[in-house]
Amino acid sequence: MKSVRLMHALCRRVQHTFLARRRDVEQRRHYAEKCDSVIKGVVVGVYAKEGDRQPKMTPSGEKFDDRVQGKITDLIRETGLSGQLGKGRVFMNVDAEFRAVAVVGVGQEGAGFNDLEMIDEGMENARVAAGVGARALQLQCCTDVFVESMEYAEQAAEGSALAVWRYNTNKRRRDRTLISKLELYDSPDSDAWMRGLFKAESQNLARRLADTPANQMTPTIFAQSTVDALCPCGVSVEVRSMDWIESKSLISFLMVAKGSCEPPIILEIAYCGTAPEDKPILLLGKGITFNSGGLCLRPKDCLSMYRGCMSGAAACVGFIRAAAGLSLPLNITALLPLCEIMPSGMAAKPGDVVSLLNGKTLGFVDVSKAGVMAMADPLLYAQTIYKPRMVVDNSNFVYKQFEKAGALTGDRVWRLPLWRYFKELIMPNDTFDSSNRGRGPASSCIAAVVLHELVPCVDWAHLDIRNVGMLTRYNPLPYLLKDRMTGRPTRTIVQFLFQMACPDGK
């Protein structure tokens, strides 16, 4: 009996010891999450070698190299770094303050505007190099990443902030990727750096909204997220429910939305940066939070990506937040129709016809192409109520401004034709005035032609961002993640609004 008691006592002691060791292991396993230590890293640039000349460090890179007694130059020579754009190495324990140093190629020194590519290569090279370096240091668990300007502080901020961002919401806290804190290194141009962070954070906001799973980003949740993001910035957000939509007779939008149990919502957003009586720039963003294709269901393999059909609305939220943060001196009004497209007994059927606010009829011939239907009546309503000076949903002036903005931000635009030829491609019918379907594959041009018929004589631009604001699958930019939502073209529109507000660039 005594031996049995001793055995039980021994088992309890072993069990307690095991549990204590297990707790100790768990504490060690989670120690990194609880640790408050700061790990610093720095990104410096190196220009590509030309001919027999060896790679040359940027001015800030040379200062840092002098600080560490030429160690960086020696390491560049030993590792064979060529300064090729986006190629680099991370060196550890070179400096007492910075645990890791990322040396990244910035491409050719003195790169400027490329007329053939329609892009400012110097600015884009800074984005790429800063983004590659910041992400490399993020993978080394650097909590604070210092990035040199590479002669373009604003663009370096954009590239690094876009590169280190992650959509982590649905991962366990201990498994989430560290989002490094970014600081400008060795440059007095802090204003440009902050502008770049504002623009990148606005695009990251659009990326988060678009990348969130559809069940976590319904029209109602999107509306609440918009209120949370914009109202603290002094932006007015009005949330319009089904009753309001019906009272305004926005029938084309309701036809698209009625197949889902999720109630549709329209957001009216107003940013006032100048005199209230000044006419606003009107923005419309398609906010289909999930597009199943309705009765014409899309293939199952690609259904998930169609949560990104609200990328236009997400970009609108992002660049209005940036406009407020940058205090742009102009008035902006945005209308965001939010809904889901689902198959059900209430869903729109091929061949349905609606009467628009202008008295014309529009046939819903192809239910898988619902964007035109969702935007038609809201576009007519917004023009009537707000009487804008410009509608961004084609004048030469507007395109030239977008072309310039795209060249400066690295997110370029390409003007598509708006010829009468495409109007003739719209399927003719004796029973309605127009339709959302046309002959041939030029669906972007056909959609623009249909919407163009609804716009009176004001400056107008239709941005088709299909497969641009959604998943990045082919040749992604180095500072964006593959197979994730891009948030494009948020920064281009922010730059466009800046050009409209400040024509002299000040």
Protein language model annotation of sequence segments:
Residues 2-278, 480, 487, 502-505:
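Glycine-/small-residue-enriched capping loops at alpha/beta junctions
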Residues 73-80, 84-86, 223-506:
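A generic structural signal for tightly packed, nonpolar segments enriched in small/aliphatic residues
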